[in-house]
Amino acid sequence: MQYSTFAAIDIGSYDVILEIFEISKKRGIRSVDKICHRMELGKDTYTLGKIRPEMEEELCRVLADFVRIMEGYRVDDYRATASSAISEASNSLYVLGKIHQLTGLSVTVLSNSEQRFLSYKALAAMEDNFNKIIEKGTAILDLDGGSFQISLFDKDALVTTQNIRMGSLRVRERLAGIQSETEHYEEMVEELIWNEVSSFKKMYLKDRKIENIMLIGDVFTDSVYQNIEEKTTKIISRENFNTWYEKIIRQSPMELAVKLGIPLENASLMYPSAVIYKCLIDMMEAEHVWIPGVHMTRGIAYEYAEQMKLLKGGHNFENDILMAAKNIGKRYAVNRPHVQNLEMTALAMFDATKKMHGMKERERLLLQMAVMLHDVGKYISFNNVADSSYNIIMSNEIIGLSHIEREMVALIAKYNTAVLPSYDELVMESSLSAEQYLTVSELTAIVRLANALDRSHLQKIQSIRAVLKERELHLSLTVDRDFTLEQGLCQDCLLYTSPS
């Protein structure tokens, strides 16, 4: 049986993890070995704003050991990732350079949306349970040291996702100086996070019924399960979760460490983690809590298997990305019929000109998102739509997109109505590469032309046939009323093309 050996490394807020996987079409993703080294990088970053030299040296030693383990397993490929503990450190570039110099590892720093997306892919690796559960109102609560993410699913589609920077390690360090002054530490944690939690409830829950909650995080041990059935299914009742919670908050970290056989540092994080989870579960009033016990490293392996076509996933993650954009558009009252008409014409032109522009499915997805969000700025200002649209898109997290991809979508929306500056001008305030700039310019041209073809917002085009003939794009349109306005205005649009 053919299989690929893959290594996933996660540099987290309070631990560094290496997991070795065997991936095959027949057996799927199978974990072979997992090594976890405890070190609180996040403590340095969240309190000092940087990673101390001694912590950096320890990290490099651990990663060098991981490299030797990977060599022992003869891994075919690897991916190393880091999140907020590295990205928020003022000396992050130096630390990443040192890691590469001493270990040879190239570490990818994930944006929050990319990190959470991998966590969802870890859940999808257990796809039978995952797809079944999210058919009904479901919330995924993903807690780590730096923040927690709340994502709502309904009818197998992502409704919304929001990040709140109140992770277990960040909360613990923030309250460390005043913890000894109270006998009710849990009440302080509740008060600290309640404003954000209640705001989320007002904005996104309203009359929505949440039947299931999935908890992602390393805080749980088998102590959370009250019987064999729960341990087997990984699903517990809300009542039994509350029983576990009461046991946790009544014991000191030292007592927890001894009783549960875990490091003292882990025990100290169980307090804020348990309180955060309890607040969210009470707010949503869900009766069933699923604790799958998966780690992001499995999500990294899942994504690798998808990219290498070793596995075909059962859940449509691209649809989740599009649903996130659709719901942002809904929140900012976009003209949905106009957007749907624009999407039809823009995608037809993109597909017809593939041989000319050479872009792939990922760029097509970015085009769809730009179309969905190109007019969100009207919610703030009709006279400054371009800048308003850009700011709204950049301020909203879109699960599954990297920061640079979100910026590309925002720029396409902005320059749909404004003049696109030269690359030399744009790069002064943007992190786009020259290649990404060309992608933005080409997709912007498509959106401009498609937008001009529905300038009246009356959806006159009923169907479109786009054909590329000798570097000329020919559009055959079926319209249901006079098209003079659109014909005149589309003459002003220039379609950028790449050189042959």
Language model features: what each stretch is:
Residues 2-29, 134-160, 218:
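Gly/Thr-rich phosphate-binding beta-strand-loop-beta motif of the actin/hexokinase/Hsp70
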Residues 377, 489-495:
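Feature 926 captures the class I aminoacyl-tRNA synthetase adenylation module centered on the KMSKS loop
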Residues 475-491:
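A short interface-forming secondary-structure element
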Residues 496-500:
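Conserved small/polar residues in nucleotide/adenosyl-binding loops
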